[in-house]
Amino acid sequence: MKKIRKLTEADVTAESAFFMQRRQVLKALGISAAALSLPNAAHADLLSWFKGNDRPPAPAGKPLEFSKPTAWQNNLPLTPEDKVSGYNNFYEFGLDKADPAANAGSLKTDPWTLKISGEVAKPLTLDHDALTRRFPLEERIYRMRCVEAWSMVVPWIGFPLNKLLALAEPTSNAKYVAFETIYAPEQMPGQQDRFIGGGLKYPYVEGLRLDEAMHPLTLLTVGVYGKALPPQNGAPVRLIVPWKYGFKGIKSIVSIKLTRERPPTTWNLAAPDEYGFYANVNPHVDHPRWSQATERFIGAGGILDVQRQPTLLFNGYADQVASLYRGLDLRENF
């Protein structure tokens, strides 16, 4: 495993740069302005977050047993746990960054089953306990880059997705892997109300090429900071693909299906000119409405300590994954 390059410090970001305009997409989808947070309110919410650690801590999850392989430990500065668990995109629980932490307590994660089906020789249905018993858990410190041009460094706990897929024995027809979030409108207000959920079509769906899913960096994740995932971070099981933008990291997964054809994905369905299927982190391919050349790293300090830094190709994992895309036009296949 090649060494991951260390993040660099840069200039402080101006307040006006913090608020990304992804909500404009939702307006284009027919969501009324009254249903969305006003820019000033959004700025105030973000500023209140960065004042310091004055928010109540997220409920503690169950402690997990896991190893810490040296290949996945590094000197990257971690984003504090309260920010990882309190600053989220999970539109099933609301559009503002604080909404998931405030509203996701309604999600029932026990019992939980995960179904693996499609182009496999051995379809599987596993409950959450079986998942964590069958596969040894390990902590991996990964960069996380949001398409909104902010980033974190997070100590995820999970196991390589390829281990689960190998258990199901993909057939020669399998070319893609489709993922689906639980559909539970009675528990997820954003699925119940199009204004709360941003007008997206639910359940949330995502997809990868099979070779991407089988890559050793791709993690099926059940914990963070030594404990089981809190609901707002995608409990009880979510996907982490560290070289892709965060919206590829589908949360609260109930179905993994191997397919012959490329599966639909939620944000690509909503705005195909803005959110591609691949969604590889690429500083040379801008979002139509903002640059992807730099990012704001969310670390331990307040707003005056927030660091702006260059975005790295494939989020710093180019040595490990660039070969997956040899010969592919990354501008066209964004």
Swiss-Prot record:
Textual note on the cofactor: Binds 1 Mo-molybdopterin (Mo-MPT) cofactor per subunit.
Gene Ontology molecular function terms on file: metal ion binding; molybdopterin cofactor binding; oxidoreductase activity, acting on a sulfur group of donors, quinone or similar compound as acceptor
GO biological process terms held by the UniProt record: protein repair
Catalysis: reaction(s): L-methionyl-[protein] + a quinone + H2O = L-methionyl-(S)-S-oxide-[protein] + a quinol; L-methionyl-[protein] + a quinone + H2O = L-methionyl-(R)-S-oxide-[protein] + a quinol
SUPFAM superfamilies for this protein: Oxidoreductase molybdopterin-binding domain
EC code: 1.8.5.-
NCBIfam families noted in UniProt: PRK05363.1
Quaternary structure, from the entry: Heterodimer of a catalytic subunit (MsrP) and a heme-binding subunit (MsrQ).
HAMAP family: MsrP
Function, in words: Part of the MsrPQ system that repairs oxidized periplasmic proteins containing methionine sulfoxide residues (Met-O), using respiratory chain electrons. Thus protects these proteins from oxidative-stress damage caused by reactive species of oxygen and chlorine generated by the host defense mechanisms. MsrPQ is essential for the maintenance of envelope integrity under bleach stress, rescuing a wide series of structurally unrelated periplasmic proteins from methionine oxidation, including the primary periplasmic chaperone SurA and the lipoprotein Pal.
Listed name of the protein: Protein-methionine-sulfoxide reductase catalytic subunit MsrP
Source organism per UniProt: Escherichia fergusonii (strain ATCC 35469 / DSM 13698 / CCUG 18766 / IAM 14443 / JCM 21226 / LMG 7866 / NBRC 102419 / NCTC 12128 / CDC 0568-73)
